[in-house]
Amino acid sequence: MAGPHLKVFFVVAEAVPYAKVGGLADVAGALPKALARMGHDVRLVLPRYSSVDEARFKLSARAEFAVTYRGQRTQVGLRETLGGNGIPVYFIESPPHFHRPTIYSQPDDLDRFAFFALAALEAPRAIGWQPDVVHAHDWHSALAVARLRATRAGPRPAAVLTMHNVQYQGNFGPEWPGQAIPDAGTLGLDRVLAGGGNHSMLALGVANADAVNTVSETYAREILTPEYGYGMERLLQSRGDRLCGIINGIDYQELDPATDPALPVHYSADRIAPRARNKAALQRRAGLPEKTDVPVLGMVTRLADQKGLDILARALPRVLDEMDVQFVLLGTGQPEYHRLMREVADRHKDKAAFVEGFDPA
């Protein structure tokens, strides 16, 4: 029997097709569409980065409102477009915060995304829409969860926090909340620290969420250990009754090889022969010799210790020296792995290619 239809508000730092750095964008682009197909009223908010093209995405002005941060009232705009399945997608317009060369890795990321989280909570009120659930993702929007619990008297939306990677926490110094956030004392930082948490946005979100979710049942167990909890394992253990893991899915509409516009040639489970032409196209695009009898190993990943890049960096040269294979890596991440992958590609020009960045094609 179907449950009640809910109003769900996603608060995210990135979502395809508007802004993408990692897997968070894929989930934030696909999950709202799946929920909408189930009959829920789903809406999405993210920052209006300079890379979000107004003409391409047909952005229109929806509202203006003020956000208080670091003792100042800042006027922001709310832009709107319709995404997949007719889902309203909103963008917080504040050029000083979001018109930057990159989405992340700015020296004031903590302030940028704290401002975004506070602005995101004001957006529903500005458009006259009251969500039943606010669903924040990772540290960038975790403050919205803490703020929601702290400032709403009486009935309020349920607060859900999904952690895609516990290693990235949005850490701050002990003095920062009082300097930056109005009524910071209501956020329960003392409760966070007493529960084994640390000074971080993610810890504030975990401590205040009605439900805490992560990307698989296995990862939900792993983050309870010192090896994978990155200093948050005690706090996560204390929220064990509210913690679960739900494995990420994929968007079958976007990633169907029978219709995917990014593929040079379409194929299906019943017709796989055309894949050979896609392989040749990948070899050309990567600058590798077109060899029909050589397997091509492809890898799309964030270049980080957590993804096993340290193991890959040691093993790959031997594989390429001893086996007749080609290897293509697509991704971004830690600078040392960029350097190592470039060195491997330079030493094995006919066998290895490193494509820096993310490209859905």
Model-based region annotation:
Residues M1-A361:
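Catalytic cores of nucleotide-sugar-dependent glycosyltransferases that transfer UDP/GDP/TDP-activated
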